[in-house]
């Protein structure tokens, strides 16, 4: 699993060192990663062949000509870049992706299980704060639902 958060600096050629743990997880038919504009946030999404296969599987399940299939093909497959690791474990981010997300200096690489994201550092800090608040609220709601379900279940057991 891609885990943890790392801050890395882009060099003048838009190269970043990919954390060793991430390089090992991305191992597959080629020595590198697949990257594309995320469809859920303003960042680059990346991963190994398993992530590519997962998105491709979702796309293949949709009928040819389905508007969602076309949107996913354009957004994911059309925006995807196959980025190979150099001998120092770096990838060179495409200029188009750097321009799209304002990646010019420091970036944040965030592990999300089966994938990772590359963010402009300040944009990620704002995103992380919003996600923490959403997680807090969601967890509180989930706990309330679980308590209500336990109470309802225990109430049904004693009514009979």
Swiss-Prot record:
Domain SpoVT-AbrB: 5-51, 80-123
Signal peptide: none
PANTHER family recorded: TRANSCRIPTIONAL REGULATOR MRAZ (PTHR34701:SF1)
Organism, scientific name: Phenylobacterium zucineum (strain HLK1)
Keyword rRNA processing: no
Gene: mraZ
InterPro entries, alphabetized: MraZ (IPR003444), MraZ_C (IPR035644), MraZ_dom (IPR020603), MraZ_N (IPR035642), MraZ_sf (IPR038619), SpoVT-AbrB_dom (IPR007159), SpoVT-AbrB_sf (IPR037914)
A GO CC term attached to the entry: cytoplasm
Listed name of the protein: Transcriptional regulator MraZ
Localization annotation: Cytoplasm, Nucleoid
């Amino acid at each position: 699993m891609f885990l943890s958060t790392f801050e890395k600096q882009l060099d003048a050629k838009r190269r970043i060192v990919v954390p060793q743990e991430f390089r090992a997880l991305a191992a597959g038919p080629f020595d590198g990663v697949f990257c594309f504009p995320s469809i859920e946030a303003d960042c680059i999404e990346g991963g190994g062949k398993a992530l590519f296969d997962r998105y491709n599987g979702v796309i293949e399940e949709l009928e040819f000509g389905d508007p969602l299939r076309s949107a996913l093909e354009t957004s994911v497959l059309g925006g995807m870049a196959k980025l190979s690791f150099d001998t120092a474990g770096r990838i060179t981010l495409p200029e188009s992706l750097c321009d799209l997300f304002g990646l010019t200096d420091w970036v944040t690489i965030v592990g999300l299980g089966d994938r990772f994201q590359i963010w402009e550092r300040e944009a990620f800090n704002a995103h992380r704060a919003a996600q923490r608040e959403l997680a807090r609220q969601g967890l509180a709601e989930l706990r309330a639902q679980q308590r209500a379900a336990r109470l309802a279940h225990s109430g049904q057991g004693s009514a009979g």
